[in-house]
């Protein structure tokens, strides 16, 4: 639901399970969205094609773009401006993903699948200057330097 902050009036709503075939994860649907400008980014994890990450217009609820076929995590997406370019970082259930937040074009991904039963990725990407780190449950941590154009150089 998108609510008017002072009155609580419902402005628009989406049934993520119905619209995107988003499965109930281990702890149910518990997305932690990100608002940036006029957009709302959600790690939906839908089973419908290319509905892993969905960007909505925050005013209308209209879909701006959708990308990846990854299942959802409980991590909040993160946007950072690096080398004069906006970068969207998302930890999904299977990958660390970097995308262009304006059009959803995927720049790169790093495998970080859960290797333990009854576990979920939940740590939001950490950004410091031009470095981004992703931590997964049971599959370690990766750290990369973001290069101009959105590409990466793995540090560790």
Each predicted region: which residue ranges?
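Noncatalytic, solvent-exposed loop/strand surfaces
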Residues: 1-156
